[in-house]
Amino acid sequence: MSPVSHVAVLAFPFGTHAAPLLTLVNRLAASAPDIIFSFFSTSSSITTIFSPTNLISIGSNIKPYAVWDGSPEGFVFSGNPREPIEYFLNAAPDNFDKAMKKAVEDTGVNISCLLTDAFLWFAADFSEKIGVPWIPVWTAASCSLCLHVYTDEIRSRFAEFDIAEKAEKTIDFIPGLSAISFSDLPEELIMEDSQSIFALTLHNMGLKLHKATAVAVNSFEEIDPIITNHLRSTNQLNILNIGPLQTLSSSIPPEDNECLKWLQTQKESSVVYLSFGTVINPPPNEMAALASTLESRKIPFLWSLRDEARKHLPENFIDRTSTFGKIVSWAPQLHVLENPAIGVFVTHCGWNSTLESIFCRVPVIGRPFFGDQKVNARMVEDVWKIGVGVKGGVFTEDETTRVLELVLFSDKGKEMRQNVGRLKEKAKDAVKANGSSTRNFESLLAAFNKLDS
């Protein structure tokens, strides 16, 4: 059958944005084999997410296209995670435009829809220019999406307060967000006069979302119903919660993974799993506090830690803890979290990690760094009650001991596990045949099937 439609998929190639977008595209492509999906991202991103270990199979109607990452010749990464993002965003509109023209030339089929990471707000202008629908995908939680929609109002309401007063205020004027304080907000949201490309990107996104045909969200209806319904009714956004996108069914279990083998030897709910994502690790003093506490208490642990970060661990720590702990440079996180030996997940509270902890019924110790992570951590502790945050946002030996004992050994920790268990069942129900996320996916698929009809 000749393809009748051509969807341009524009990815944001940093953090864990591109992988869930590809998961969604792969599912759409399987359900709509007569649609071409041209997937645009940077070459390094494509190499990573199109690896055969990440998905069971990639649809034959999905074709990846590499776009320039925007970094100047001879660029050397300074360590600031915002730096490569801003280079990419500066060049992104022209780069994506050129790449889409190449895809049209290759396929002989004009673009009939733009499916993009929600960060790429300029896709709204592209879609208007060529007269096709724009469907942004928000890969984080509904709570953080809502905050970006209300950026101007939040800035206006807090303008009269000084810094100390702001810190005590909550976002009680937006339904479902009364637990969020000003100090939890993403830095880019509150930087009113910032000329940061990333801050401007997020602001523009919030202003452009009303132009979307639908907004697909990597979440499920039952976790934030008040927020989702508010976005639909008050902001007139066609929110389609279609998550969790990354489930065990969408990843291949490693056949011979050393950390999974090690977990099989551990007692149920006894192991601390530590991973802070792919972008940043705690500073050296916090790494030392974590390590010292784990060693002194002899708490079994599995730590996903890149080789270059191990220099911040106490000398000979790995050797001294080898009988009850394990450090690996990479871990298959979903399969680790589903193992019954895991008792708690020490995490930065990125949304993918938070969703995975819910889907695998593991309570959380949150140490957020930037972006939506502080918002997620607040929801984890005070709204969903499935974990605890680190006081002051800093691991000390005393604080590490407190949070580990709270989650692993106290009645409060048992309540957290019960709460996350209830959320897990709701997440599982959402992706069942008649679940809310499945119905929303079918609504999204129907929008694609209407293309060129």
Swiss-Prot record:
**Which organism was this protein described from?**
Gentiana triflora
Q: Does the keyword Glycosyltransferase apply?
A: yes
Identify the EC number(s).
Answer: 2.4.1.115
Residues that span the membrane, as ranges: none
Q: Which reaction does it catalyse?
A: an anthocyanidin + UDP-alpha-D-glucose + H(+) = an anthocyanidin 3-O-beta-D-glucoside + UDP; delphinidin + UDP-alpha-D-glucose = delphinidin 3-O-beta-D-glucoside + UDP; pelargonidin + UDP-alpha-D-glucose = pelargonidin 3-O-beta-D-glucoside + UDP; cyanidin + UDP-alpha-D-glucose = cyanidin 3-O-beta-D-glucoside + UDP + H(+)
Binding-site positions, an anthocyanidin:
17, 148, 371
Could you give a GO molecular-function term held by this entry?
Answer: anthocyanidin 3-O-glucosyltransferase activity
Protein name, per record? Anthocyanidin 3-O-glucosyltransferase
Residues annotated to bind UDP-alpha-D-glucose: 139, 331, 333, 348, 351-353, 356, 372-373
Please give the PANTHER family that the UniProt record associates with this protein.
GLUCOSYL/GLUCURONOSYL TRANSFERASES (PTHR11926), UDP-GLYCOSYLTRANSFERASE 74E1-RELATED (PTHR11926:SF1560)
Q: Where is the active site?
A: 17 (proton acceptor), 117 (charge relay)
